[in-house]
Swiss-Prot record:
It comes from Methanocaldococcus jannaschii (strain ATCC 43067 / DSM 2661 / JAL-1 / JCM 10045 / NBRC 100440) (Methanococcus jannaschii). GO terms for molecular function: transmembrane transporter activity. CDD domains: TM_ABC_iron-siderophores_like (cd06550). The keyword Coiled coil does not apply. This is Putative ABC transporter permease protein MJ0087. SUPFAM superfamilies: ABC transporter involved in vitamin B12 uptake, BtuC. GO terms for biological process: siderophore-dependent iron import into cell. Probably part of a binding-protein-dependent transport system. Probably responsible for the translocation of the substrate across the membrane. Keywords: Cell membrane, Membrane, Transmembrane, Transmembrane helix, Transport. It is found in: Cell membrane.
Length: 349
């Protein structure tokens, strides 16, 4: 087999894998629309989507299940892509928004905005609300930015190894968690209920306004990462190789980390902490299709959407009518994966 034929086969396998994920995402979305306390048939779902459904079915589809599905897709894409890019930029397979402390920094910023400025809270009925989603997003981004800046400064000034950067991320996570607990200590009962509930990654709280904001951040971020795909491939080959190919490595790392932080911040501000999606998805995709970022970025996005949607559907149905926060399930999945990767790294050493 000559080189052009090998390249066609190489590309064809990746495209087929992407198509399989698209089909899986579509079927999972239909299934998620049908299952729940209020079970629906496919015909009822289609009629509601076409505008011909009954009022009660329309309410369930458009106000409850569709927002949840779109939140899962957008959040899964955002976290998976952020994780894939961070693993490249930091040259560490353990890097992700969760393990680097970015999620906890965003959580601290969001809680600070909720308590100190009253941008969100809880009603006596238990319903969580957001008064100003834009300001909460800004504060969440600022919290994440603090963690990113500290880690990058330590890496630059002290020449941290990839392993030490993960430890720095763990330290920042602990610091932000302590800050969040301090804020909780001075909160009243309703504010405390809102903050504790916020720490659970839950897609059920998403509303259309927040989904539009998440999509408005995710789409241009994904476009930017695809635009920089060749630079990321060069970085995978090594620092000196990337520089010899004309890549401004410091600028690429800085902007990549900032965009990944913004993606994470928006998701945390509206949905809470959903851990390990950014760690699991890029690794599984890399095993299946390799490390070419031309394909790794979009297929990681699809895989993240599928994983989070299936996990959320499972969380809604496993002990129905009780709905588990999806962040609990992703942590159960991600923690063993994290330990496996950690042991694998130290075996190489």
């Amino acid at each position: 087999m000559d080189i052009p034929q090998k390249y066609k086969l190489y590309t064809k396998k990746k495209i087929i894998f992407g198509i399989i994920l698209l089909i899986t995402l579509f079927l999972s979305s239909i299934y998620a629309l049908c299952v729940g306390d209020y079970k629906l048939t496919v015909n009822q779902v289609v009629n509601a989507l076409m505008g011909y459904g009954k009022d009660d079915i329309n309410l369930v589809i458009w106000n409850i299940r569709l927002p949840r599905i779109f939140a899962a897709i957008i959040s899964g894409m955002s976290l998976a892509v952020a994780g894939a890019v961070m693993q490249c930029i930091l040259r560490n397979p353990l890097a992700s928004p969760f393990t680097m402390g970015i999620s906890h920094g965003a959580m601290f910023g969001a809680c600070f905005a909720i308590i100190m400025f009253g941008f969100g809270g809880a009603e006596s009925t238990g319903r969580i609300f957001i008064n100003n989603p834009y300001m909460i997003t800004i504060f969440a981004f600022l919290g994440a930015l603090i963690g990113v800046v500290v880690i990058l400064l330590l890496a630059k000034l002290r020449g941290l190894t990839p392993e030490a950067m993960i430890l720095a991320g763990v330290a920042m996570s602990s610091l932000f968690t302590a800050g969040t607990m301090l804020i909780q200590y001075f909160a009243d009962d309703l504010q405390l209920a809102a903050m504790v509930y916020w720490t659970f990654g839950d897609l059920g709280r998403a509303i259309w306004t927040e989904i539009y904001i998440m999509a408005a951040v995710m789409i241009p971020s994904l476009i930017y990462f695809m635009y920089k795909r060749w630079d990321y491939n060069a970085l995978e080959a090594g620092e000196e190789t990337a520089k010899s190919l004309g890549v401004n490595t410091e600028r690429t790392r800085l902007i990549g980390m900032l965009v990944a932080s913004l993606l994470t911040s928006v998701n945390v501000a509206f949905l809470g902490i959903i851990g390990f999606v950014g760690l699991i998805c890029p690794h599984i995709v890399r095993i299946c299709i390799g490390g070419d970022y031309r394909f790794l970025i979009p297929i990681s996005a699809l895989f993240g959407a599928v994983l989070l949607l299936i996990a959320d559907t499972f969380a809604r149905t496993i002990i129905a009518p009780i709905v588990l926060p999806v962040g609990i399930l992703t942590s159960f999945l991600g923690a063993p994966m994290f330990l496996y990767l950690l042991l694998k790294m130290y075996k190489r050493v």
